[in-house]
Amino acid sequence: MTTAAQIPGLDAAPTKHARLLAWVREIAELTQPDRIEWCDGSESEFDRLTSLLIDKGTLVQLDDEKRPNSFYAASDPSDVARVEDRTYICSEKAEDAGPTNNWLDPAEMRTKLGKLFSGCMRGRTMYVVPFCMGPLGSHISALGVEITDSPYVVISMRTMTRMGTPALDQLGDDGFFVPAVHSLGAPLEPGATDVPWPCNSTKYITHFPETREIWSYGSGYGGNALLGKKCYALRIASVMARDQGWLAEHMLILKLTSPAGKVHFIAAAFPSACGKTNLAMLIPTLPGWKAETVGDDIAWMRFGDDGRLYAVNPEAGLFGVAPGTGEETNPNAVKTLWGNAVFTNVARTDDGDVWWEGLTPDKPAHLIDWKGRDWTPDSTEPAAHPNARFTVPASQCPTMAPEWENPAGVPISAILFGGRRATAVPLVTEAPDWQRGVFFGSIVSSETTAAAAGAIGKLRRDPFAMLPFCGYNMADYFAHWLEIGNKADPDKLPRIYYVNWFRKSPEGRYLWPGFGENSRVLAWVASRLDGEAKGTETPLGILPAPGELPTEGLDVSEADLETLLSVDTEVWRQEAELIPEHYNTFGDRLPAQLWAEHEALTKRLNG
C-alpha cells in the first residue's frame, strides 16, 4: 500500500490548514490515487481539464460559433438521476433521521464505505476542490472541500460554486469546512482502458449530520456527485441551520418591482416539475412590473440585525432540467445558455449544437440521441433523457438581480409554498400568521392521479418541497420552522402564501394560464404586503377579494376565476380528512401546534 507521502501532489498543498491537510492525507491513503491535484478554479485549469475530458471521450466540444466554450456529455445509461433509494442520513440515532429518510447505523455505514473506498481511486487523479456556498465574504455563506476522482465534477463545481483559490483563502488556517468525499468507484488497473463515463452499479450517497460529512460513491451524475448542491446546501446545511437558528431551504428567490418602484424579495418552494425555475425567471405579463432572479433552487436565510430574514443563493450556477425548457416556457433560461455551458444527456444536432424536447416547436430532421443513436422525428423514444441537464453560470441569466451576490443577502418579504394540485387548493391563499403558514408548508402535495368530479386524486406529499432533501427528522424540521417564528418579531417575519398554478376543470382543462400570468398573483401578494389589498377571510386563509386580483388582459372566464379564488368547503372537508394519515407518519414527534391547526381548520370548515 502506497503511503500518502509517496503520492505526488500532497506536498504541493497551497494551505497550512491542519485539519484539511490531515483529512486529504487520510483519504489519499484510503483511496490510493496516482496523484493529487489542488484545484485553483482558474481558466487555465478549466481548459486543461476539458481538453483531458475530450481526449477521454467524456466531453464533445460544441460548435464554437453556436455555443462558445460549451460541451456535451453523455452519461452511462444507468447513471442519469439522483438515487433516492441509495441516499442515507446516518445520524447517531435512527429516530433523528426520521421516517422520510433512509438510515443505517453510522458505524455500520463507515465499515461499508471503508471497504468500497479502499483503493477506489487507483489509476486516477484525486482532485481537492475547495468551494464556497454563497457569496465570498458573506456571514450567510459556508465553506466545503470536495475530494473527487472525476474531472467532470471539477469543471461542474467551478460553475456551480465559488471554487478554488478564493475559497481556500477564505478558509484560512483553521476555518470550518464540510468535508465531502466523492469517487466514481472505478479504479483503473495499469494498462486498462478507461470508459467515457466511469461509474459503479453500487451507489451510496451518505450524510453524517453530527460530523457534517458527505461520502458519495459510484455515481458521476450531478446531484450525486456535485456535493455542494443537494448534499451540502440542503441535507447537511438543514442540520446546521437547525443547530444555529437559520433556514436552509429548497427555494427560489426573486426580486419583484412594482410600477411605483416598490421592491419585494420573495422566496418560493415547489416540488420538482412545479415551475420553480420558470417563476425564478418570470417575465411578467402585467405592464410596469419587473421580476429579477436572485436564485432558482436553494435559499439560505438568516436573521439580520433589524430582525428580518435575509437570504442568499448559495449557488453560483444553474443546474437545470433541459427538456421542457424553451422559448415559450422559459426564454430567459434559453438566453442564459448562449455559451460556457455543459449539457449532459441532451441530443446533438448535425451542425454541432444541442437540442431537447421543448426547446423548439419543430423537431430537427436528424439528431444523435443521448445514447449515441441516430434519431428522427419518427423515433419512438425521446432524443434527450427526461432528466437531461445543463450547467451554466448564473451570472449569464439576463434577469439576474444586481443583489444576487450581495454578501448581506436580500430581505425576504414573502414565502410561497405550492404543489401541482388539480383540485381543492385555490390560486393563492395568505396565512394569517406564521403558524398557519408552517401548516400550509407541512401539507404541500401534488396529485399523482386524476380525480373524479368533486373528489380529490391520489396525493403525494412533499412538505416544504424538502422531502428528498431534509437532513434530519421532518417532524423536528416542522418544529424548527415554528421555533423560528416564535423567536422573531411577527411584524418582521415574511408572510406565507399557499399557491397553486395547476387547478383543473372536471374535464381536465387548466383553469389558469400560468407562466408570465403568475405575475398577477405576485402583484396581489405585493399589494397585501403594502397594506393596499384587503383580502377576504375564508376557512383556509385570506384570499383575494373580488376585483383585487389584476385581470385586465387576462384570458380567464369569470366562472373559472371564481373557482380559482374560492374555497369549496365540501372538498376541503375531504382534504382535511386526508391530513392525519400524513401527520401520523411522524408519530409523537409531530409538533402539537400542527395538530391544533388541523383541528381548527376542521372546525372552521364545519362552522
Curated annotation (Swiss-Prot):
SUPFAM superfamilies: PEP carboxykinase N-terminal domain (SSF68923), PEP carboxykinase-like (SSF53795). Its EC number is 4.1.1.32. Pfam families: PEPCK_GTP, PEPCK_N. GO terms for cellular component: cytosol. Coiled coil: none annotated. Its cofactor is Mn(2+). Binds 1 Mn(2+) ion per subunit. Mn(2+) binds at residues 230, 250, 297. InterPro entries: PEP_carboxykin_GTP_CS (IPR018091), PEP_carboxykinase_C (IPR013035), PEP_carboxykinase_GTP (IPR008209), PEP_carboxykinase_GTP_C (IPR035077), PEP_carboxykinase_GTP_N (IPR035078), PEP_carboxykinase_N (IPR008210). The active site is at residue 274. It is an enzyme of class 4 (lyase). One of its GO terms (biological process) is response to lipid. Catalyzes the conversion of oxaloacetate (OAA) to phosphoenolpyruvate (PEP), the rate-limiting step in the metabolic pathway that produces glucose from lactate and other precursors derived from the citric acid cycle. Belongs to the phosphoenolpyruvate carboxykinase [GTP] family. This is Phosphoenolpyruvate carboxykinase [GTP].
